[in-house]
Amino acid sequence: VMSHSATLAGHVVVGDHANIGGLAAVHQFCQIGPVAMVAGMARVVQDVLPYTIAEGFPAHMRVVNKVGLERAGFSSQKIKEIRKAFRILFTRDLRLEEAVAEVRKEIGESDEIKTMLDAIERSQRGLARPDSATFEMNVG
């Protein structure tokens, strides 16, 4: 779903069930993951990972999109798994490559986790990372 006056530059990839709010602008070659939500008036200059909400100027990851996941039919167990993966990726003191390996080790690679990790590994513009204090509060 794309709201009024949202703008996508060239070669942007938008995943299934993603939402882009009004007046949001997405830079060329960015990827918006499946079941992600970009808040209104956000300036997206890096990839928005699957299953997250991004907001701000520039956009940063705010929280796992729990409501969107529920609406898309994800089970509560899958949502817990996704939240755990994001905690490993962004709240531990690990380099991203180490955190990806840790997710694979601790959680495995269900379809949802594989979608997340694939998005990280193929990112060309970098990731719209979380503001750590806010993200820890919202993912914990």
Q: Where would I find each of the regions flagged by the language model?
A:
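Terminal amphipathic alpha-helical/low-complexity segments used for targeting or macromolecular assembly
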Residues: 51, 57-140
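Left-handed beta-helix
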Residues: 2-10, 15-16, 20-28, 33-34, ...
